[in-house]
Amino acid sequence: MPFVLPTRVLETDEISLVLAFGKLSVLEACTVLGRTVTQAEAPCERVSVFHVAHLPPKYIAELSGAHKCAPVTSVLDSPSADMTSLTGFMASYLEDKSNVSLSGYEIGEDDYEDLVRSMLNGIREAGLKKVRLLRPEGNELLSERVLTRAALDVVAFPYHEGFALGPTAWVPDSAAMRQRGTRKPSPHSDISLSPRLARTLVNLAGLKPGQTLLDPFCGSGTILVEAYAKSLRCLGVDSRASRVQEARENIRWSIGGVTDRGYDIRKGDARGLSRMLRGTKVDAIVTEPLLLPQLHARPKTSTARAMIGESAKVYNDALASMAESIHSEGRIVVVVPVIQTMEGDEVTLTLEGRKLGLRLYQPGPVGFEYPVRLSFESTRWIRRAVYVFEPRS
């Protein structure tokens, strides 16, 4: 995962993350960063600010649900305010003819232009007269472009009735993730889990290398491939023999065809896990049980409720089976569908874990309302939300 500035830049008490999945990305960050997070703020939908104590940069490199990470180095009352502290820092990493950019999130066009002007003036006052300004489409330099254009990118967003700014210090290796989705023998479809989302879900499980993750609705194995890449032992189950074969081919491809005993994928029923596992408990379960049919138009609310109702029994029966098979300190991560209707309603499949001895996972100082919705999805009228359960102690 590329650090585009020295890791010491992140040795600060405030960092900002540009979110890939909205609140789900915040949940992932609170899980991965753990006790280093003392407070989290959501100044806008695209960016969250985390107050941290003694944050090892290696934790940042584990994140999948963030597009960028930047320390908060300047907070301005107005877009034309002095930003010497930021531009002085930038000048120490720039040479004349270096590329610079400003990525503005939920900032108006006039304020964005004023911020760009203030940034350039500050850099030039520091003695760099020939830096090149990249003007990104939509006022946001995408994370991959930060790397390909070798730009010193500044993240800016509304904060405390003013603006917060900081240099992008880290971006994820999005190209490698995308290749795992498109080059494997059985690529994921437009409506199935992306590798990035699958890795985010795996991170919510909070496992250490060598522990065991089970996906009881594994499909073509996207979650298992991402879990294996984190050195986890992988168990996969699917009721369709064709999908079991696809999952085996994909995970074998992901490790270069090497024969390995770190995974086991078999045909079976997710509602009978305890019998299948012969009473063995797994460290985590991460799964998307059923992908509803792709919709070509928003359904009526009554139709959406009927669709959810037909799937609810499978989900709840499977959750009961998962509860019997999870280790006492493990987690269960389940994706559920959210249907947007023509009347403007959202119909969500809800899960109840209390009677199964489960409670909702709440990391650190932030309280989450479940199911946690994904933002910025392109799946049109069927979207996703996520439950994370853990056994009651």
Where are the predicted features?
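A gly/proline- and charged-residue-enriched helix-loop-helix capping module
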Residues: 113-139
